[in-house]
């Protein structure tokens, strides 16, 4: 992450050597990863749909959330701090105490309904990890609730970073050949968002539905035709 941050910001112009933002981004990623692994020790599965709910879970694989401010790439808030609303929901479901079995069944059902009413989405490994899976949501290493808009944004960030990549990316006395180390992750910065876009083509919209969740089962539908067409245009 530190290398990516340097490639995004190229902070060594002239005598410049302010890498504070890059260091903070890298440390925030380590903190997020630590919380992620603690979540696994608690038995919580990956939730790759969390990035579509305002980064609702540390159990996602997060891509740094990058912004452009006054024509420059900002690393502020690249990684979220603390646990998210999905994490609290999962812990409440898994660790809440109830006085009796009947109370437990009723209480757990209420927790599920509360999470659904809050708009919390969940997709885990079996439906999302491979590019062959048909789910149109729940992607690794991406951001936002609209993968096509997110692709346009990360492509603009990538273009700006590549335009600035050069001598200012390297600290003093660094070998020029080491520029390739920063080039590769920046050149491929949009690669995971491309996968999210590709899954819109012929992709399915569905959730993990149980009997009784809805008056009429929701089932599954295909991604809207206009969304699929836009996705194909982006891929081309």
Task: Give each language-model segment a name.
Residues 38-52:
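Catalytic Zn2+-binding segment of zinc metalloproteases
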Residues 30, 46, 50, 63:
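Active-site proximal loops enriched in glycine and acidic residues that flank catalytic Cys/His/Asp
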């Amino acid at each position: 992450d530190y290398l990516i941050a340097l490639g995004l910001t190229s902070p060594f112009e002239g005598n410049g050597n302010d890498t504070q933002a890059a260091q903070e981004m890298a440390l925030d990623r380590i903190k997020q990863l630590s919380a992620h692994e603690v979540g696994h020790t608690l038995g919580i599965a990956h939730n790759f749909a969390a990035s579509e709910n305002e980064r609702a879970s540390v159990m996602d694989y997060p891509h740094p959330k990058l912004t452009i401010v006054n024509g420059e790439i900002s690393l502020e808030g690249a990684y979220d701090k603390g646990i998210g609303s999905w994490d609290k929901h999962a812990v409440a479901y898994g660790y809440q105490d109830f006085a009796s079995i009947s109370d437990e069944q009723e209480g757990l059902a209420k927790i599920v309904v509360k999470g659904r009413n809050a708009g919390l989405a969940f997709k885990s490994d079996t439906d999302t990890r491979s590019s062959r899976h048909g789910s149109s949501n729940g992607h690794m290493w991406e951001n936002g609730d609209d993968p096509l808009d997110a692709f346009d944004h990360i492509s603009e960030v990538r273009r700006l970073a590549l335009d600035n990549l050069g001598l200012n990316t390297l600290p003093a006395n660094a070998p020029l050949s080491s520029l390739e180390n920063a080039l590769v992750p920046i050149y491929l910065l949009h690669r995971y968002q491309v996968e999210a876009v590709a899954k819109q083509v012929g992709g399915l919209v569905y959730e993990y539905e149980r009997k009784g969740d809805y008056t009429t089962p929701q089932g599954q539908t295909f991604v809207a035709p206009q969304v699929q067409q836009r996705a194909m245009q982006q891929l081309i």
